[in-house]
């Protein structure tokens, strides 16, 4: 039976960018339902608007639900999941270039990281958690993604050269994400 996968993009992006269309196509071909959410005003994002977009689009959160997030999409999803009461169990989450601390080069995003996330709550809702980060990420420092991985007690996948995993970094496909997700779905 197919799973429901939500892909949540980051700052300055859209569903048509980077590796999102490729991943969506691959997952649909495997029989999954895939939604690449269109986050509003991505070049001037507002936390409340982004949380509302998740609330309006994420339906039936259960063990067949998986999330793949990129950059700002990661902390947005964690903030969203944390505010659900109760937070149902769900399939898994892969956070690409995720962060939970302020980014010195993008202070306008500070409102997304002000509130500390209740990581234990999210950890207890899913056993399948992964963070992917590149050592040469020029936007989100590698250490911030590593910190997030520790806080969320995830599997951690360091990549030597990936930048911020953007189209301009050469990422129009991203087999690592696809493989990790498939492994998560198999272990269900």
Where are these regions (language model features)?
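Active-site nucleophile loop of the alpha/beta-hydrolase fold
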Residues: 10, 39-42, 93-103
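Gly/Ala-rich beta-loop-alpha elbow adjacent to hydrolase catalytic centers
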Residues: 68-78
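Catalytic histidine-centered segment of alpha/beta-hydrolase-like enzymes
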Residues: 45, 162-174
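Catalytic active-site module of serine/aspartate enzymes centered on a nucleophile-bearing elbow/loop
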Residues: 170-188
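Catalytic histidine neighborhood in serine/cysteine hydrolases
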Residues: 33-35, 149-166
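Conserved alpha/beta-hydrolase "acid-adjacent" motif
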Residues: 138-144
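Active-site catalytic motif of lipid deacylating hydrolases and related acyltransferases
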Residues: 2-63
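Short beta-strand/loop motif that positions the catalytic acidic residue
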Residues: 125, 130-133, 137
């Amino acid at each position: 039976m197919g799973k429901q996968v939500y892909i949540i993009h980051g700052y300055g992006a859209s569903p048509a960018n980077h590796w999102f269309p490729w991943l969506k196509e691959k997952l649909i071909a495997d029989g999954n339902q895939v939604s690449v959410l269109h986050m509003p005003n991505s070049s001037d994002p507002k936390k409340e608007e982004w949380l509302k977009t998740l609330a309006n689009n994420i339906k039936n959160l259960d063990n067949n639900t998986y999330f793949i997030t990129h950059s700002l999409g990661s902390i947005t999803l964690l903030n969203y999941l944390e505010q659900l009461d109760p937070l149902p169990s769900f399939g898994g989450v892969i956070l690409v270039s995720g962060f939970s601390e302020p980014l010195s080069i993008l202070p306008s995003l500070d409102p997304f990281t002000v509130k500390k996330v209740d990581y234990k709550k999210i950890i207890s809702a899913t056993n399948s958690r992964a963070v992917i980060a590149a050592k040469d990420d020029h936007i989100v420092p590698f250490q911030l993604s590593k910190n997030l991985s520790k806080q969320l007690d995830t599997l951690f996948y360091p990549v030597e050269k990936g930048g911020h995993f953007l189209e301009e970094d050469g990422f129009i496909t991203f087999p690592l994400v696809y493989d990790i997700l498939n492994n998560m779905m198999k272990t269900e």
